[in-house]
Curated annotation (Swiss-Prot):
Residues 1-35 are cytoplasmic. The keyword Endoplasmic reticulum does not apply. Keywords: Cell membrane, Cytokine, Disulfide bond, Glycoprotein, Lipoprotein, Membrane, Myristate, Phosphoprotein, Secreted, Signal-anchor, Transmembrane, Transmembrane helix. This is Tumor necrosis factor. It comes from Tupaia tana. It is found in: Cell membrane.
Length: 234
Protein backbone atom coordinates (compact mmCIF):
# COMPACT_ATOMS: atom_id res chain seq x y z
CA UNK A 1 0.00 0.00 0.00
CA UNK A 2 1.39 3.43 -0.95
CA UNK A 3 1.75 6.36 1.45
CA UNK A 4 -1.02 8.31 -0.35
CA UNK A 5 -3.50 5.44 0.09
CA UNK A 6 -2.68 5.20 3.80
CA UNK A 7 -3.29 8.91 4.28
CA UNK A 8 -6.58 8.72 2.34
CA UNK A 9 -7.76 5.76 4.44
CA UNK A 10 -7.03 7.66 7.65
CA UNK A 11 -8.98 10.72 6.45
CA UNK A 12 -11.93 8.54 5.40
CA UNK A 13 -11.87 6.88 8.81
CA UNK A 14 -11.99 10.28 10.47
CA UNK A 15 -14.95 11.39 8.31
CA UNK A 16 -16.84 8.16 9.02
CA UNK A 17 -16.68 8.65 12.77
CA UNK A 18 -19.75 10.31 14.28
CA UNK A 19 -19.01 13.82 15.39
CA UNK A 20 -20.01 14.72 18.94
CA UNK A 21 -19.95 18.06 20.53
CA UNK A 22 -17.04 18.95 22.82
CA UNK A 23 -16.10 17.17 26.03
CA UNK A 24 -12.92 15.52 27.32
CA UNK A 25 -13.64 12.20 25.61
CA UNK A 26 -14.02 13.86 22.22
CA UNK A 27 -10.76 15.76 22.67
CA UNK A 28 -8.86 12.63 23.65
CA UNK A 29 -10.32 10.77 20.69
CA UNK A 30 -9.20 13.50 18.30
CA UNK A 31 -5.71 13.44 19.78
CA UNK A 32 -5.48 9.65 19.42
CA UNK A 33 -6.65 9.79 15.82
CA UNK A 34 -4.15 12.52 15.03
CA UNK A 35 -1.32 10.55 16.67
CA UNK A 36 -2.34 7.37 14.82
CA UNK A 37 -2.44 9.24 11.54
CA UNK A 38 1.02 10.69 12.14
CA UNK A 39 2.50 7.30 13.05
CA UNK A 40 1.03 5.62 9.97
CA UNK A 41 2.34 8.32 7.65
CA UNK A 42 5.77 8.35 9.30
CA UNK A 43 6.03 4.55 9.24
CA UNK A 44 4.99 4.27 5.60
CA UNK A 45 7.43 7.00 4.59
CA UNK A 46 10.28 5.35 6.49
CA UNK A 47 9.52 1.96 4.94
CA UNK A 48 9.42 3.46 1.45
CA UNK A 49 12.79 5.16 1.97
CA UNK A 50 14.43 2.00 3.30
CA UNK A 51 13.19 -0.05 0.35
CA UNK A 52 14.04 2.64 -2.18
CA UNK A 53 17.64 3.06 -1.05
CA UNK A 54 18.24 -0.68 -0.58
CA UNK A 55 18.79 -0.58 3.17
CA UNK A 56 16.43 -3.54 3.56
CA UNK A 57 15.23 -6.15 1.11
CA UNK A 58 17.14 -8.65 -1.08
CA UNK A 59 20.88 -8.10 -1.14
CA UNK A 60 23.12 -8.84 -4.10
CA UNK A 61 25.52 -11.71 -3.60
CA UNK A 62 29.18 -10.87 -4.10
CA UNK A 63 32.06 -13.31 -4.34
CA UNK A 64 34.75 -12.69 -1.74
CA UNK A 65 38.15 -11.69 -3.06
CA UNK A 66 40.42 -14.63 -3.79
CA UNK A 67 37.67 -17.15 -4.56
CA UNK A 68 37.80 -16.72 -8.31
CA UNK A 69 39.38 -19.62 -10.10
CA UNK A 70 42.27 -18.61 -12.29
CA UNK A 71 43.88 -20.74 -14.98
CA UNK A 72 47.56 -19.74 -15.32
CA UNK A 73 47.64 -21.00 -18.90
CA UNK A 74 44.60 -18.95 -19.90
CA UNK A 75 46.11 -15.94 -18.18
CA UNK A 76 49.31 -16.36 -20.20
CA UNK A 77 47.54 -16.77 -23.52
CA UNK A 78 45.53 -13.62 -22.82
CA UNK A 79 48.67 -11.57 -23.44
CA UNK A 80 48.46 -12.55 -27.07
CA UNK A 81 44.75 -12.02 -27.64
CA UNK A 82 44.47 -8.76 -25.70
CA UNK A 83 47.49 -7.12 -27.31
CA UNK A 84 49.01 -6.14 -23.97
CA UNK A 85 52.66 -5.20 -24.61
CA UNK A 86 55.21 -7.44 -22.87
CA UNK A 87 58.92 -7.94 -23.39
CA UNK A 88 58.96 -11.27 -21.57
CA UNK A 89 59.74 -14.32 -23.73
CA UNK A 90 57.03 -16.97 -23.57
CA UNK A 91 56.12 -20.17 -25.38
CA UNK A 92 53.27 -22.66 -25.26
CA UNK A 93 53.20 -25.50 -27.79
CA UNK A 94 50.91 -28.51 -28.15
CA UNK A 95 51.40 -32.07 -29.40
CA UNK A 96 50.64 -33.01 -32.99
CA UNK A 97 47.61 -35.34 -32.79
CA UNK A 98 48.29 -36.67 -36.30
CA UNK A 99 51.70 -38.07 -35.39
CA UNK A 100 50.95 -40.80 -32.87
CA UNK A 101 54.30 -42.54 -33.23
CA UNK A 102 56.23 -39.73 -31.55
CA UNK A 103 55.73 -36.59 -29.49
CA UNK A 104 55.99 -33.72 -31.96
CA UNK A 105 55.40 -30.14 -30.78
CA UNK A 106 53.47 -27.60 -32.86
CA UNK A 107 53.30 -23.83 -32.49
CA UNK A 108 51.15 -22.70 -35.42
CA UNK A 109 47.87 -23.86 -33.96
CA UNK A 110 45.03 -22.37 -31.91
CA UNK A 111 45.93 -21.67 -28.28
CA UNK A 112 49.68 -21.77 -28.89
CA UNK A 113 52.16 -19.03 -28.12
CA UNK A 114 55.67 -18.12 -29.26
CA UNK A 115 56.71 -14.54 -28.47
CA UNK A 116 59.62 -12.19 -27.84
CA UNK A 117 62.40 -14.30 -29.27
CA UNK A 118 61.28 -17.79 -28.26
CA UNK A 119 61.77 -20.31 -31.06
CA UNK A 120 60.75 -23.90 -31.77
CA UNK A 121 63.65 -25.59 -33.57
CA UNK A 122 64.03 -29.36 -34.10
CA UNK A 123 61.23 -30.03 -31.60
CA UNK A 124 63.03 -27.96 -28.94
CA UNK A 125 62.25 -24.56 -27.41
CA UNK A 126 65.22 -22.21 -27.72
CA UNK A 127 65.69 -19.60 -24.97
CA UNK A 128 66.40 -16.07 -26.34
CA UNK A 129 67.95 -14.46 -23.24
CA UNK A 130 69.43 -15.14 -19.81
CA UNK A 131 67.12 -15.22 -16.80
CA UNK A 132 64.71 -17.18 -14.65
CA UNK A 133 62.12 -19.23 -16.52
CA UNK A 134 59.07 -21.22 -15.49
CA UNK A 135 59.07 -24.50 -17.40
CA UNK A 136 55.97 -26.73 -17.44
CA UNK A 137 54.60 -29.69 -19.37
CA UNK A 138 51.64 -32.04 -19.26
CA UNK A 139 51.05 -35.39 -20.96
CA UNK A 140 48.11 -37.78 -20.78
CA UNK A 141 48.36 -41.51 -21.40
CA UNK A 142 45.44 -43.83 -22.07
CA UNK A 143 44.89 -47.51 -22.75
CA UNK A 144 42.53 -50.45 -22.41
CA UNK A 145 43.10 -53.13 -19.81
CA UNK A 146 46.31 -54.00 -17.97
CA UNK A 147 48.86 -56.44 -19.42
CA UNK A 148 50.79 -59.02 -17.42
CA UNK A 149 53.96 -56.95 -17.72
CA UNK A 150 53.71 -53.65 -15.80
CA UNK A 151 53.56 -50.55 -17.98
CA UNK A 152 55.78 -47.68 -16.83
CA UNK A 153 55.46 -44.23 -18.33
CA UNK A 154 58.26 -41.66 -18.12
CA UNK A 155 57.90 -37.95 -18.82
CA UNK A 156 61.13 -35.94 -18.95
CA UNK A 157 61.92 -32.27 -19.52
CA UNK A 158 65.56 -31.78 -20.48
CA UNK A 159 67.94 -28.94 -21.28
CA UNK A 160 70.92 -28.81 -23.61
CA UNK A 161 72.91 -25.85 -22.24
CA UNK A 162 75.16 -23.79 -24.48
CA UNK A 163 77.78 -23.65 -21.72
CA UNK A 164 78.55 -27.39 -21.67
CA UNK A 165 76.46 -28.80 -24.58
CA UNK A 166 75.26 -31.79 -22.59
CA UNK A 167 71.68 -32.94 -22.13
CA UNK A 168 70.56 -32.62 -18.51
CA UNK A 169 67.20 -33.69 -17.08
CA UNK A 170 65.45 -30.80 -15.35
CA UNK A 171 62.15 -32.55 -14.57
CA UNK A 172 61.36 -36.25 -14.59
CA UNK A 173 58.46 -38.45 -13.49
CA UNK A 174 57.52 -42.13 -13.71
CA UNK A 175 53.99 -43.50 -13.35
CA UNK A 176 52.14 -46.76 -13.87
CA UNK A 177 48.38 -46.91 -14.52
CA UNK A 178 47.99 -50.57 -13.57
CA UNK A 179 48.26 -52.09 -10.12
CA UNK A 180 47.59 -55.61 -11.33
CA UNK A 181 46.92 -57.53 -14.52
CA UNK A 182 43.39 -57.66 -15.91
CA UNK A 183 41.99 -61.08 -15.01
CA UNK A 184 41.39 -63.53 -17.83
CA UNK A 185 37.84 -63.26 -19.10
CA UNK A 186 37.25 -59.96 -17.29
CA UNK A 187 36.19 -56.85 -19.16
CA UNK A 188 39.14 -54.68 -20.19
CA UNK A 189 38.36 -51.22 -18.86
CA UNK A 190 39.92 -47.99 -20.14
CA UNK A 191 42.41 -46.14 -17.94
CA UNK A 192 43.97 -42.66 -18.01
CA UNK A 193 47.27 -41.54 -16.51
CA UNK A 194 48.15 -37.81 -16.53
CA UNK A 195 51.57 -36.43 -15.65
CA UNK A 196 52.15 -32.73 -14.99
CA UNK A 197 55.51 -31.18 -14.15
CA UNK A 198 56.75 -27.65 -13.60
CA UNK A 199 59.63 -25.73 -12.06
CA UNK A 200 61.69 -22.53 -12.16
CA UNK A 201 65.22 -22.62 -13.58
CA UNK A 202 68.05 -20.23 -14.40
CA UNK A 203 68.67 -20.46 -18.14
CA UNK A 204 71.06 -18.87 -20.60
CA UNK A 205 70.59 -17.51 -24.08
CA UNK A 206 70.67 -20.38 -26.56
CA UNK A 207 69.69 -23.13 -24.13
CA UNK A 208 67.46 -25.73 -25.78
CA UNK A 209 64.56 -27.33 -23.91
CA UNK A 210 62.76 -30.55 -24.78
CA UNK A 211 59.86 -32.55 -23.34
CA UNK A 212 59.74 -36.27 -24.14
CA UNK A 213 57.96 -39.50 -23.20
CA UNK A 214 59.10 -43.11 -23.49
CA UNK A 215 55.87 -44.57 -24.92
CA UNK A 216 54.25 -41.97 -27.20
CA UNK A 217 51.86 -44.54 -28.70
CA UNK A 218 49.86 -44.39 -25.44
CA UNK A 219 49.38 -40.61 -25.58
CA UNK A 220 45.76 -39.45 -25.55
CA UNK A 221 44.99 -37.01 -28.36
CA UNK A 222 41.20 -37.18 -28.01
CA UNK A 223 41.11 -33.45 -27.23
CA UNK A 224 43.42 -30.87 -28.73
CA UNK A 225 45.69 -29.06 -26.29
CA UNK A 226 45.69 -31.53 -23.40
CA UNK A 227 49.31 -32.52 -24.14
CA UNK A 228 51.46 -29.39 -23.97
CA UNK A 229 54.87 -27.87 -23.21
CA UNK A 230 55.62 -24.27 -22.21
CA UNK A 231 58.20 -21.76 -21.00
CA UNK A 232 57.59 -18.33 -19.43
CA UNK A 233 60.27 -15.80 -18.50
CA UNK A 234 59.84 -14.42 -14.97
Amino acid sequence: MSTENMILDVHLAEEALPKKAGGPQSSRRCMLLSLLSFLLVAGATTLFCLLHFGVIGPQKEELPDGLRLVNPLTQTLTLRSSGIPSDKPAAHVIANPQNKGELQWLNRRANTLLTNGMQLVDNQLVVPSDGLYLIYSQVLFTGLGCPSTPVLFTHTVSCVAVSYNNKVNLLSAIKSPCQKETAEGAEAKPWYEPIYQGGVFQLQKGDRLSAEVNLPRYLDFAESGQVYFGVIAL
